[in-house]
């Protein structure tokens, strides 16, 4: 499984879910952090998209919205990605949905922080 991209998002997490989510990205998705400091991790993908994880003490002064954030990981093999996140202890939500006319498939999962994320594959 290869992760091909995501859109930029910043997510604020309590310390325990911060660590678990960072571990999921590094160990399961094999994404190395471009920046990894106390309470902050920046993941920069080859296509230029970024994900920033913040623990509460590292949030910028201007803060972030209090509402939930969801985004999708574009992967090259949605079946392998589904198996990998499930093996990492994440809950798969629903079945893989295939939209043949768009050559697009997707599935959601609940990450270690309790948020819903997506997996998507474009052929």
Model features per residue range: what roles?
Residues 1-22, 69-71, 123:
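N-terminal beta-strand motif that seeds the catalytic metal site of vicinal oxygen chelate
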Residues 1-7, 86-123:
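Vicinal oxygen chelate
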Residues 21-26, 85, 114:
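Conserved active-site tyrosine of GNAT-family acetyltransferases
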Residues 30-36, 91-96:
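Short secondary-structure junctions
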Residues 31-66, 116-122:
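Conserved short beta-strand elements that form part of the metal-binding/catalytic scaffold
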Residues 42, 50, 72, 106-108:
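Short hydrophobic/aromatic beta-strand element in the GNAT-like acyltransferase core
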